[in-house]
Amino acid sequence: MTKFVFVTGGVVSSLGKGIASGALAAILESRGLKVTLIKLDPYINVDPGTMSPLQHGEVFVTDDGAETDLDLGHYERFIETRMRKANNFTTGQIYQSVLDKERRGDYLGKTVQVIPHITNEIQDFIKRGARYDTPDAVDVAIVEIGGTVGDIESLPFLEAVRQMSLRMGPNNSAFVHLSYVPWIAAAGELKTKPTQHTAKQLREIGIQADVLLCRADRPIPTEERDKISLFSNVPAWGVISMWDVDTIYKVPRMLHEQGLDGLICDKLRLHTPPANLKRWDDLVYATEHPQTEVSIAMVGKYVDLSDSYKSLNEALRHAGMKNHAKVVITYVDSETLTPDTVSSLAQFDGILVPGGFGVRGVEGKICAARFARENKIPYLGICLGMQVATIEFARHVAGLKDANSTEFDPLTPHPVIALITEWKDADGTIKTRHAKSDLGGTMRLGAQSSDVSPNSLAHSIYGDVVTERHRHRYEANVNYLDTLRKSGLVISALTQREHLTEIVELPQDVHPWFVGVQFHPEFKSTPWDGHPLFNAYIAATLEQRSALSQAKKAETAKPLKVVAST
């Protein structure tokens, strides 16, 4: 039977519940347990698909096409289990499901209430995510509850897991509570009072924490931990310090050395081999001992919040580790780039243009793509980054003046990027949409396969077939592909079903490394293997850096021209 660990947070949000949950899952997985993670989000949105990245961070996409919280990206980077739609749900989904049942008459005329109908539905969703009572059920499901204790929005979720724990019995569930222990510079000490209060709030709704993870900017001394233990009713060995580190991949070792996994296994009566964290130690060593460095300009429109590109940042760092290089990412606001300012990108070893929506900042991205093409700087365009590269090529190489996407200019004379109105989803279901369709859930989503052209750069990276995750509405217009091909653009991958453009590139005798992809490869990158596309991209930037360095040395070594004096 599946055991459950419920992870809650207090005092403030953004403490790192997702990192803590993923790290705990990684340690338990290293003990030989089958683990999954589930994220409960208390907002009323059905999913984060229509939320601003500047407010919510990136939207992480699963293989089965779910638009989910960015924490699911952390989960996939910490453990082997792949996430599904069932691993993330929101208040909006819960209420939508309950109201659908009410309309069908499933409640047989009863008054539908938060307790028991909403709380029961939450429990059913949790069990579904854990595959509870099924042949492929996991050993441990770690359930992260978004928000903080005391928020009105979180109360139904907290009540649901309280009931669930009561029904399952004390040895089948555990509660881990994250709290903030601030350092007050003026007083020169850590303050434990906020943690005492949040533990009390948790008890007031019927939940006693088994473990307190105390977040701070430094390790918390024993004296403060003993004080927290006394006032929170948690044994001293259950008060664990979780301090700031320079890489999240140090967190599993940090928590293991303080005995967190042992505490959880004892509470849940799980008998397992000791944890083996060698792979994490090796990973941290690789992170801390790069042999070289490479600089990447990420030209985006959501650069004010780095979490908007969380998986992309991690994918670049993973590729850096595979190439024994430190990747230094500089965020460039695409709205600041014009033909007069784009030369500022010359200082970087590579240019990357990520995905995005809407017309704001698009011309700056087009400038970046042109600068990379004309100056032979390694370029990787993802989703919108592929589309702007196609638009730029159409305008300045193929001679299609004012070429554009109908997303940005519905009246463009050359819509080289346009809205596709019918396609098959990841599960084969035929979907339709038009310009006035709802924004939520109307994109091409999830994993889909494409055939890769032989003798292409893409083929050297992926082989014959590429399967990647998608999240977009607009596609390269098939009516312009022949024109673009004749002008020198290589269409190196097409979807197997609709033959839509998936990868474009420039021949390597024209440009050393120029690739645009319609999908989102960053969602499948892992710290162990990186991702073949990002690995190749960073390798190309390193080659470019080395070639420029050698050319500069050769230029410096030239003998001085002697001018005869008169």
UniProtKB/Swiss-Prot annotation:
Task: Please list the residues that bind L-glutamine.
Answer: G356, L384, G385, M386, Q387, E407, R473
The disulfides recorded in the entry are: none
Record-listed E.C. numbers:
6.3.4.2
The pathway entry for this protein reads as: Pyrimidine metabolism; CTP biosynthesis via de novo pathway; CTP from UDP: step 2/2
Residues crossing the lipid bilayer are none
- Superkingdom assignment: Bacteria
- For the keyword Membrane, the answer is no
Q: Which GO terms describe its biological process?
A: 'de novo' CTP biosynthetic process; pyrimidine nucleobase biosynthetic process
| Record-listed ATP binding positions | S14, L15, G16, K17, G18, I19, D71
Q: Which residues bind CTP?
A: S13, D151, I152, E153, K191, T192, K193, P194, T195, Q196, K227
> CDD domains in the record, alphabetically?
CTPS_N, GATase1_CTP_Synthase
Active site as annotated: C383, H520, E522
Q: What class of enzyme is it?
A: ligase
Q: What does this protein do?
A: Catalyzes the ATP-dependent amination of UTP to CTP with either L-glutamine or ammonia as the source of nitrogen. Regulates intracellular CTP levels through interactions with the four ribonucleotide triphosphates.
This protein's assembly is summarised as: Homotetramer.
Protein family (similarity comment): Belongs to the CTP synthase family.
User: Would you tell me the protein name for this molecule?
Assistant: CTP synthase
Which organism's genome codes for this protein? Polaromonas naphthalenivorans (strain CJ2)
